[in-house]
Amino acid sequence: MMPFFPHRVLKRKMTALVSPHQDGQIIAHLLKWFHITPINGSSNENPRQSALELMRALIHGYDLCISPDGPRGPRMRMKKSPIYFASKTGKPIVCACYSSKPCKIASTSWDRTLIPLPFAKGVFALSNPIYVPEGLDDDGVETYRQKLERIANLQAQECDALAGNPVIEPADVYDFKKKEG
């Protein structure tokens, strides 16, 4: 449902970073169905090249779809990369989320992904554009990261409540780091 939204409703050109591996290529194929241009890349393998490709897309008028908690979590904890992209390009960040019912919540995955079931009804939410100043120091980046994380998580809670789903809470950062280490 979410991939359908930008092209059909907002009439925007969209791109998203997808893994060059087999699972990512399945996602890339699906994104093309929704008129979202996939960029093959990884935040692990050659992240600088991936960042350059994403910057080029932004400069050429594409909006960038980023999962703000990254490919490995922790769940619902914003990474810094959206803030860096916005700061470098002057493009705003718009937090977008959805919830639907009926759905399946992937309870065994770290991110508790919500998967809409056929004929589900959905709720979408978009924040107002959030502009990030150029040249932020580390404290400024962290301030914006926390602000965006709060906005995105409140939106997700509102969408879940409107759809009649249980609220999925952000992961405890301390517990997540303990499991990784």
Task: Give the positions of each predicted feature.
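Catalytic core of membrane glycerolipid acyltransferases/transacylases, capturing the structured
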Residues: 1-45, 89, 104-106
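Non-catalytic C-terminal accessory region of glycerolipid acyltransferases
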Residues: 10-11, 33, 52, 56-181
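Short, well-ordered alpha-helical scaffold segments within catalytic/effector domains
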Residues: 24, 48-55
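A conditional alpha-helix N-cap/helix-loop micro-motif detector
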Residues: 44-48, 75
